[in-house]
């Protein structure tokens, strides 16, 4: 029987498969599902739109673009998600408004050791370009890149994840803000909104919500 443990409830286990928000005894490819169910209610997977989700546990970053489904009901972290045959395939983890992520083997992913480095998340505003740790209109960013190109590169100290309606990017910068690395994912996505999926705790439970994030536009 497949077992799933929510990172937000302290369920990270380095001996199990790890995906954003969960550790599990199985590695489910969640890209293959078009319909899922929660407590016998069926929900369609959203087409061509994804949610960038991540956990930060034991100085490890586990992030990925995940499928999501629309649901107007209130779902708890840890609620089971099943396929159409009744097999459990995941649990509730992250939410953005009325959309819930389906965690497992997703699309583009990022697994990092955070020893000595930071990672930051940003909403990429429509029409903006990115250089390193800043976003702005294209002409401003072009000038910024020219300015920074004169500097010698140093060790990476921070990663920046940029989530936009049409494209997602990951950049890495040194101490001067010089861009050292960039990845582009040609998919539109959203970031989870923290604390909208509430956790009911017993009096002897401890709360571990290290997987929640604060996503705000940055300039």
From Swiss-Prot:
Outcome when changing residue 186 to A: Stalls the 2',3'-cGAMP cleavage reaction at an intermediary stage
Keywords from the named record: Early protein, Hydrolase, Nuclease
Inducing or repressing factors: Expressed in the early phase of the viral replicative cycle.
Outcome of gene disruption: Knockout induces a 40 fold decreased replication of the virus.
HAMAP family, sorted: Poxins
Functional note: Nuclease that is responsible for viral evasion of host cGAS-STING innate immunity. Cleaves 2',3'-cGAMP which is produced by host cGAS following recognition of cytosolic DNA and blocks the subsequent 2',3'-cGAMP-mediated activation of TMEM173/STING, which normally spreads to adjacent cells and activates the interferon and NF-kappa-B immune responses.
Domain commentary: The substrate binding site is formed by the N-terminus of a monomer and the C-terminus of the opposite monomer.
Family to which this protein belongs: Belongs to the poxin family.
Subunit structure as annotated in this protein's UniProt entry: Homodimer.
Protein name in UniProt: Poxin
Organism per entry: Vaccinia virus (strain Western Reserve)
Gene behind this protein: OPG188
